């Protein structure tokens, strides 16, 4: 068995189990676009160093891919109270199909998350502008995958205290290097979602 594949699966399992032990605020999100649906479950905990977030998620696209992910980030309030930044890691595991090609995705990527709350003087409805970027170079990709990148941006409308409507954009790009040579899959989509906090 390929050593990179074994190491990738071990790291992925460690990241998943590390997120299970933390608890504080929970966030459950479901969003859907034209051909994809995504679900997320995050746990947010205040620790001595800042805000620790762990989470699991999955994206299913009927055009040919299934991707599960796990994240671990640490952040704190920046110098502005409206701005929150998080840095961490994101593990991804999935299967991609494109035409007659089929590849397995396993990667550990660097993750950046940012959220800016628009002041109430500008908007009467509480709105957050959220962005997320994850990148895994060749050295952190396993199985058939050679490079992984995803980007997400959204407007989060807080309609009630614990519920948010999300309007967003998502972009995913994966490069493979397997016995059929190098090939890529990319997908972008607008989506609408709903998030509950409890």
Model-derived segments and their meaning:
Residues 2-3, 7, 74, 96, ...:
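Generic N-terminal leader/processing signal
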Residues 51-53, 65-69, 82-86, 105-109, ...:
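Short connector loops at helix/strand junctions that flank enzyme active sites
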Residues 27-30, 42-46, 73-81, 85-100:
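Outer-membrane beta-barrel proteins and related beta-barrel translocases across Gram-negative bacteria
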């Amino acid at each position: 068995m390929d050593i990179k594949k074994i190491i990738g699966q071990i790291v992925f399992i460690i990241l998943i189990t590390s997120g299970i032990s933390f608890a504080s605020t929970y966030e459950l999100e479901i969003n859907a676009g034209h051909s994809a649906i995504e679900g997320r479950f995050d746990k947010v905990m205040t620790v001595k160093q800042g805000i620790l977030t762990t989470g699991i998620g999955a994206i299913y696209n009927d055009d040919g891919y299934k991707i599960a992910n796990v994240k671990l980030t640490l952040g704190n309030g920046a110098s502005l109270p409206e701005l929150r930044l998080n840095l961490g890691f994101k593990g991804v595991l999935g299967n991609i199909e494109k035409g007659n090609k089929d590849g397995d995705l396993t990667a550990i990527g660097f993750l950046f998350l940012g959220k800016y709350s628009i002041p109430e003087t500008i908007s009467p409805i509480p709105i957050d502008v959220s962005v997320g970027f994850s990148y895994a170079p060749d050295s952190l990709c396993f199985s058939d995958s050679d490079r992984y990148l995803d980007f997400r941006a959204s407007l989060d409308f807080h309609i009630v205290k614990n519920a948010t409507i999300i309007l967003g954009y998502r972009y995913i790009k994966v490069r493979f290097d397997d016995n059929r040579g190098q090939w890529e899959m990319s997908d972008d989509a607008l989506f609408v979602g709903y998030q509950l906090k409890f």
